[in-house]
Amino acid sequence: MFAGHRWQIEGVDERRKVLQVVPHKGGRVPMFERRQAEASHDMLVAEMREVYRSDDVPAYLDAAAKELLVEGRQTYRHLKLDDLSMAADGGDLNLFLWRGSEFSAVFAVVLAMAGLNAETHDLGVTIAGATEPKVDAALATLRRMPAEDWERLPDFIKNIHSGKFDEEVPIELLKRFWLRRNRSLINDVRESIGLIAATSQPAPRQSKI
């Protein structure tokens, strides 16, 4: 978002600190904010989901906060997010992962490896220009992908030079550091891919014994 419009990044001039952009084809404000001021932990996102699921209204909320809570819960139930993982947003698709921002960031890189353009939001990722069948096909490709192919994951990071002195570090070394630092999250992503339910395919509920 910039100047009230959505833009698609087409190029990055890191030396001049310049982004080359074109108007986003969707041309509308996204439903979910895709840029986060700070990282969110798994436990925080899990607690947010429990708040959406609950009917309790904390006594300390003022009238405006109560109205926002009601709207959030109505949206959660309208999108059937207790059972479903995907929801269309104009020409894009929101994928709800219900994990922290670090997990979502790794998931976005994994989707890039499958040919999808994804950006993180507070509750997962938004996939630009995607449909449910397209995402399902990409996830199926990832499920079949051999372990050695996952070692190429850093090749799909949009900007691996995120640290202050990363420009001074050889890029292949940065890639190895990224793999080592995110190994457990990568394994979590691989496990979660088989559990994602498309909007047209509700996730089965587990029966209580």
Regions found by a protein language model. Name each.
Residues 1-209:
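C-terminal effector modules of nucleic-acid-centric enzymes and ribosome-associated factors
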